[in-house]
C-alpha cells in the first residue's frame, strides 16, 4: 500500500473513495459544503437523514454518480474536537481503511486534520485498519482478498471554526 501526503484539493481526487471527517457537534466544513453542493445536496441530505453528528464511529456514504471525479464519498465522525489526538486519530483512520474494504476501493483519499504528530498516528491507523490475519483461512477464488493500493492523505482543518482561525 502506497501512502502519501498530498497538497492538492480533495475535489481533484480521481480514485474510488474520498473520505472526509467532521468533529462531533461541529458545523459542516467548507470542504464538506463544497462536496455536498457538487453532489446536488446528496451528502448533506443523507447526513441529516442519518442524524449524523460527527460522533466517533458514525459514517454516511453516497455515490457520486459521475458528479465528482471520485466514485464515492464517505463522511466519518471524528469525535470530540478536544480529544482529536492519538487513539482517536488512529481509530478514525482505521475507519477509513475499513470503509475502503467495505467499498472494495483500491485508491482512497482521506481529507482529515493531520498536522504534526497526527500524521504518524494516521499512518499507524491505516496499517492497523488493513491488517487481516489470513494465515489459517482457505483461499476463496470467487472472493479474493481486498487490496488497498493507494491512500492519499490531505490535511484539512478539524472544524469550520479551526479553518477560520487558520485563515485569520
Segments the model singles out, each with a brief description of its role:
Residues 1-168:
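Short amphipathic alpha-helical segment within the helicase RecA-like ATPase core
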Amino acid at each position: 500500500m502506497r501512502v502519501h501526503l498530498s497538497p492538492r484539493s480533495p475535489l481533484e481526487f480521481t480514485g474510488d473513495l474520498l473520505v472526509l471527517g467532521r468533529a462531533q457537534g461541529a458545523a459542516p466544513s467548507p470542504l464538506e459544503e463544497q462536496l455536498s453542493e457538487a453532489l446536488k445536496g446528496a451528502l448533506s441530505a443523507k447526513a441529516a437523514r442519518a442524524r449524523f453528528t460527527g460522533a466517533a464511529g458514525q459514517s454516511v456514504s453516497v455515490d457520486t454518480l459521475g458528479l465528482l471525479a471520485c466514485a464515492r464519498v464517505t463522511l466519518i465522525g471524528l469525535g470530540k474536537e478536544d480529544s482529536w489526538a492519538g487513539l482517536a486519530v488512529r481509530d478514525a483512520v482505521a475507519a477509513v481503511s475499513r470503509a475502503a474494504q467495505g467499498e472494495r476501493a483500491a485508491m482512497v483519499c482521506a481529507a482529515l486534520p493531520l498536522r504534526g504528530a497526527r500524521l504518524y498516528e494516521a499512518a499507524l491507523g491505516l496499517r492497523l485498519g488493513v491488517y487481516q490475519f489470513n494465515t489459517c483461512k482457505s483461499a476463496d477464488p470467487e472472493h479474493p482478498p481486498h487490496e488497498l493500493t493507494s491512500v492519499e492523505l490531505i490535511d484539512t482543518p478539524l472544524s469550520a471554526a479551526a479553518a477560520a482561525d487558520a485563515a485569520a
